[in-house]
Amino acid sequence: MASKESKPSRTTRRGMEPPLRETWNQVLQELVKRQQQEEEEQQGLVSGKKKSWVSIDLLGTEGKDIKKVNIWEPCEKWFAQVVWGVLWVLQIVLWGCLMWEVRKGNQCQAEEVIALVSDPGGFQRVQHVETVPVTCVTKNFTQWGCQPEGAYPDPELEYRNISREILEEVYKQDWPWNTYHWPLWQMENMRQWMKENEKEYKERTNKTKEDIDDLVAGRIRGRFCVPYPYALLRCEEWCWYPESINQETGHAEKIKINCTKAKAVSCTEKMSLAAVQRVYWEKEDEESMKFLNIKACNISLRCQDEGKSPGGCVQGYPIPKGAEIIPEAMKYLRGKKSRYGGIKDKNGELKLPLSVRVWVRMANLSGWVNGTPPYWSARINGSTGINGTRWYGIGTLHHLGCNISSNPERGICNFTGELWIGGDKFPYYYTPSWNCSQNWTGHPVWHVFRYLDMTEHMTSRCIQRPKRHNITVGNGTITGNCSVTNWDGCNCTRSGNHLYNSTSGGLLVIICRQNSTITGIMGTNTNWTTMWNIYQNCSRCNNSSLDRTGSGTLGTVNNLKCSLPHRNESNKWTCKSQRDSYIAGRDFWGKVKAKYSCESNLGGLDSMMHQQMLLQRYQVIRVRAYTYGVVEMPQSYMEAQGENKRSRRNLQRKKRGIGLVIVLAIMAIIAAAGAGLGVANAVQQSYTRTAVQSLANATAAQQEVLEASYAMVQHIAKGIRILEARVARVEALVDRMMVYQELDCWHYQHYCVTSTRSEVANYVNWTRFKDNCTWQQWEEEIEQHEGNLSLLLREAALQVHIAQRDARRIPDAWKAIQEAFNWSSWFSWLKYIPWIIMGIVGLMCFRILMCVISMCLQAYKQVKQIRYTQVTVVIEAPVELEEKQKRNGDGTNGCASLERERRTSHRSFIQIWRATWWAWKTSPWRHNWRTMPYITLLPILVIWQWMEENGWNGENQHKKKKERVDCQDREQMPTLENDYVEL
């Protein structure tokens, strides 16, 4: 151990205590330093060199000397006044705008009002749908890995309408095509399942029956659902329109879909989750499939005129050119050739994007005969085309692993033992449980067709493309001015394929049928001079022409080797007509092998394409917590609203100025109070930030104290372990000495020499503990830890004291307002707010009372006009015969003595009550429940009329009057006993 003089002086316990009572001067000095540092920070913030918020560094790795509170101290008065004024003016402007929108009345609809108030960015369009998580919902969730029905809301009950304006703003009248990965995942699962169980199927018998049949046959139906924050927009109304018309060829580069009505839902409609290739689908899918028969928009299109385009415009869903049916990430599902008929690329595969627009719709089989298209019997024998359309799959189709007839009534099926899943064929070793041989009439069928020239906006009629040797010069058969975009400017007088030089300079091939009908126009920008130079360069065509010869219906050129030029496979010009060389609308100078302008096929789609088509009705969006929308109200509610509107229109009040004044006064008070509270909140927030930062600094200091204490405890534990090791060493030495004594051995050069066996000596532990740490070094380190801990405790105590002081400086809202403003001069009128509110409430009550009185007076005036009408009929009685001559003696024929005194009888109270009650029952006031309280006025009206008739009022008192009654036609009057009768 070291001597007493070499030991460092120990820190007393008194010195280790934090100096809380003796450091008030230090606190004041700290406040002065902090104020100066805050001013420097504020200057740095203005110049952009400092952060506006001080970060908390618990470990002290950065900026130990900068322990700052937030730089935002209480705002100065002029700044607070400017902020208050701006907030006040802004609120008044906003309230004025809102009142202006409300006063517009019927100029806007409910969707527009909601779009005005709600967040216009309530949902975002999701373009990469493959990143959206999705799950299936079905009843058989335990077997197919789906969630149970009820996990998501029913889309038929829970929805929100999206206004048309918002749809146009987000989608720009373009409802795009999406290649959804959800059907591809379903097909991949089926494909993987078939591969894994291929060996197991070979051992099964034909009687084996499993639930997998339901999945393969498409009986497992469910929905696709997306979780929050995603949702689906389900289109309810849509139409198509052409876009980007090519001015050279006239074809539409794009066909866009405009959705005008949509709903936000969580799940799709029910559909088959998985199925193999089939032709006839379930009747539950008919409505969904029929919805994809999209009609043309109500714009000026040539195809809408059935006189020019028989059948009108085409209906269906247009899969755009360039669409990728199976993406590159899942290319193993493509197969060698496309199994979907017209849905294919230019090589008949699915490796490349689509080269031609493909239309898909629910087939209309009303005109079909025995499974063949209309006019199928009129085709050339062996041909697969009729009326300009080439048909695929007529006669035999593939349905649920069977070869089925295209005639749905026959339903003849032959099971092939193979199932097509995508582009792969899998064997099916046992008899399926589904019934294929049945009458499939009424089941929906997909119809896939392509317009190779892509002129659907001009006509829906398909044509047989002309060969080049059948294209001749018109020579007067074509008149007028037409183009590829204006087919109606020309007239033809003879059937044929006429080469025509348009006024724009390009060449046109006008296809005329039935001597007057133009069925198509193909064009190019190449003029006649350029074409004729190419024609003259052809071998042996110097003396030839393109004039029409022959007596055929379409005509032909004189020399077949000198027809309209085109480029061959070597991209060289040639005029030789070939057997399979046709002209196409989009390839005027190329060699085209397709004879017909349209291609069609029925069926041929599996569940993947079936789901893919049905899902095009939906668009994936990303929504917020509260997405705006209009919830459809019941019909009774709409009728009630209509009646209320009519009643309000009938009972419009003229004087509404006082209501507007009240509303403006309330808004002004709210704006002033809001602006004041906003400034108070800013001031209070400044103090709060300062206090919170002080508390954070104090917490950081206490954290450092804890870390130092932990280091000191570790050092003490180390010393204890050293002491324990040394004690253990001494104990080992003592044990060894005892063993030596028992073994009766002695040491010689650190070895024990004994006569006992060497195995006993191996039992003894000869390990020695070596440590260079002395007690003096350990005590010095303990002294250093104590000193450091004392300093940290003082610093932590100071920080806690400063934090408590800053926390006490936080004022409340009203004190902050008093500090920011001089309320005694500016807002001394605030003390009259209760009186103002009471006055406003009194005016409102007075207004309500006046409205009630006005309604009562109006009702009284209407009911008062209903009177009990008294009709007095005076009929003279015939004169006795014996007195007749006596009365006629005066020469006046008795009429002078017929002036009598009228006898009147007043109505009783009961009669007046009956008349009033009958008038009430027959009035429209009785049928409306809002006017039922007016029945309380009936007794007052009855009393008033009774007083008027009985003379109690004085001014309308009845007086006895004499009534002169003419005695004209008195002999025709009936004989009565009384002198007159009151009715």
From Swiss-Prot:
Q: Which residues lie on this side of the membrane: Extracellular?
A: 107-832
GO BP: symbiont entry into host cell; virion attachment to host cell
Where do the record's glycosylation annotations fall on this chain?
A: 140, 161, 206, 258, 298, 364, 381, 387, 403, 414, 435, 439, 470, 475, 481, 491, 501, 515, 527, 537, 542-543, 568, 697, 765, 772, 788, 822
Query: Where are the bilayer-spanning segments?
Result: 833-853
Signal peptide residue numbers: 1-106
Task: Note the coiled coil stretches, chain numbering.
Answer: 689-739, 780-815
Per the UniProt topology annotation, the Cytoplasmic ranges are: 854-983
Q: How does it assemble?
A: The mature envelope protein (Env) consists of a trimer of SU-TM heterodimers attached by noncovalent interactions or by a labile interchain disulfide bond.
Q: Please report the name of this protein according to its UniProt entry.
A: Envelope glycoprotein gp160
- Recite the lineage of the species: Viruses, Riboviria, Pararnavirae, Artverviricota, Revtraviricetes
Recorded name of the encoding gene:
env
